[in-house]
Amino acid sequence: MRKTDAHILVFDSGIGGLGVADCIRRMLPAATLGYVADTAGFPYGAMSDEALVTRVLTVLEQAIARLRPDMVVIACNTASTLALSALRSRHDLPFIGCVPPLKWAASVSATRQIGLLATPATVDRPYLTALMQEHGQGCTLHAHGARHLAGYAEAVFRGETVLVEAVRAELGILGMIPDIDAVALGCTHYGRLLPWLRQAMPRPVAWLDPAEAVARQAARIAITAAATAAPDSLPRAAPCWAQTVFTTGAVPDEATRQAWAAEGFPEWQPLEIASA
């Protein structure tokens, strides 16, 4: 794999990974990107841990067998937390995951009061305690699980209207504690809602989107792999799935297809899942 021809597959339950894909595209403009959206499984937060791991393993095993990428970016906090170890043990290729950027929040907070805006499934998982113990730097964490924000992000992607008042209602305690000065986004979908979140919050805070950090890690691995490639190896042609989004759910309508195209994925193909 060379920096100029890395074949990278981005995975999420929906459109949450598009921010990560955009950052990768800027950092590695010659890389080939494809996208797998497990739309039939959205939202992942509604699944049990066991069901989610089974789902992610099944979808990605079939996608990897079909597409043969050099690297897979798991642009989903929940899937990263639960399934990353199993994926790495089953496949001989790099997997990049994402976790809530609590270390970043702790590093920028002046009040030592930080927020986490995530899905209820993420907020309820015990790994947050371990993250805070390792990276919290003496901060107090105020976590809120928003039930509808991921769906609102999907609606914005489709061109539907989402009201600031609806987003404000999803902020929970984060909008009530005046000392919070940094909020980590614990769901990649939420980056699409940043304009709404800034308007909805009753005071200015730093909104921390992990998309760029995830992309930087992917770029580092791609560049390292390129540096160790044989010096006389030739660049490869882009695979047939370049700029293609694969979805597991219903066939997207024309407006949704156009929205994917506007995000750099003008081609669409179904990803048939035998069982999950």
Swiss-Prot record:
Enzyme Commission number(s) of this protein: 5.1.1.3
Positions of the catalytic residues: 76 (proton donor/acceptor), 187 (proton donor/acceptor)
Name of the protein in question: Glutamate racemase
GO BP, one annotated term: peptidoglycan biosynthetic process
Any one Pfam family match given in the protein's UniProt record, by short name: Asp_Glu_race
Pathway: Cell wall biogenesis; peptidoglycan biosynthesis
Residue pairs linked by disulfide bridges in the UniProt entry: none
Enzyme class: isomerase
Binding site for substrate: 12-13, 44-45, 77-78, 188-189
Domain of life: Bacteria
Protein keywords: Cell shape, Cell wall biogenesis/degradation, Isomerase, Peptidoglycan synthesis
A GO MF label: glutamate racemase activity
Family according to the record: Belongs to the aspartate/glutamate racemases family.
The protein's role, per its UniProt record: Provides the (R)-glutamate required for cell wall biosynthesis.
Catalysed transformations (reactions): L-glutamate = D-glutamate
Species annotation: Granulibacter bethesdensis (strain ATCC BAA-1260 / CGDNIH1)
Signal peptide as annotated in the record: none
Keyword Disulfide bond tagged: no
